[in-house]
C-alpha cells in the first residue's frame, strides 16, 4: 500500500506544482522552450482558444494568398508539412502552431539568437482572469545587444496559466477580414 501511495504522490507532484505556478514562472518556462527549441512544449503552454484563432487565420491566409497553387503548396509544405489547405485544416491547432514555430524559429540564425536569449520576468498585473506579465528580454542579434521590456499575457484555463497571443499578433489576425482575407 505504501508503494502505491508513494508512486501516486510522485506522479501527482508535477500536476500540483504546475497548477500552482505563478504567471511569472509560466512566462519564464514559455521562453525557455524557445531557447531549447522544444516547440511541442511551447504549444502545450498556449491557450487552446488562442491556438484555434491562429489556425483559423492561417487557413484563411492560405486560402486567400493570391499566389499560384504551386507557390501555395510549397509554402504549406515548408511551413506546416502539409500538401494543401485541406491537410492544413485537418491539423490540430497545437500541431499547426508547433510546426509553424519549428519552420520559422527552429533553425539557422533565429535558432542561434533564441538559444542565447535571456528572459527575466519582473512581475504581473491582474485583469480579470488574465495576467499581464512584464519581462525583460536580452539577446544578441548580429553583434548588437538588445534589451527590451515587454508584456506577455497569460490567462487561467482549467486552473492553469496559459499563454495568449500578444496584442499585436491578435490585432493582425483581427485585421485580416478588413484586408479582404477571411480567417
Indicate where each model-derived feature is located.
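Short beta-strand edge/turn micro-motifs at domain boundaries
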Residues: 108-109, 120-124, 132-136, 144-180
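Surface-exposed, charged secondary-structure patches
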Residues: 20, 63-142
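Generic detector of well-ordered alpha-helical segments enriched in charged/polar residues
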Residues: 28, 52-55, 59, 73, ...
Amino acid at each position: 500500500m505504501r508503494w502505491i501511495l508513494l508512486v501516486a504522490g510522485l506522479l501527482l507532484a508535477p500536476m500540483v506544482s504546475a497548477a500552482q505556478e505563478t504567471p511569472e514562472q509560466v512566462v519564464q518556462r514559455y521562453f525557455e522552450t524557445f531557447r531549447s527549441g522544444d516547440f511541442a512544449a511551447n504549444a502545450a503552454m498556449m491557450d487552446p482558444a488562442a491556438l484555434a484563432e491562429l489556425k483559423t487565420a492561417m487557413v484563411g491566409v492560405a486560402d486567400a494568398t493570391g499566389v499560384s497553387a504551386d507557390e501555395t503548396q510549397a509554402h504549406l509544405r515548408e511551413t506546416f508539412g502539409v500538401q494543401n489547405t485541406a491537410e492544413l485544416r485537418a491539423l490540430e491547432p497545437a500541431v499547426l502552431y508547433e510546426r509553424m514555430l519549428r519552420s520559422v524559429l527552429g533553425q539557422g540564425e533565429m535558432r542561434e539568437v533564441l538559444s542565447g536569449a535571456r528572459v527575466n520576468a519582473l512581475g504581473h498585473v491582474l485583469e480579470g482572469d488574465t495576467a499581464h506579465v512584464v519581462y525583460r528580454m536580452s539577446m544578441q542579434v548580429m553583434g548588437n545587444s538588445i534589451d527590451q521590456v515587454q508584456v506577455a499575457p497569460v490567462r487561467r484555463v482549467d486552473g492553469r496559466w496559459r499563454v495568449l497571443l500578444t496584442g499585436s499578433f491578435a490585432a493582425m489576425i483581427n485585421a485580416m477580414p478588413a484586408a479582404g482575407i477571411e480567417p
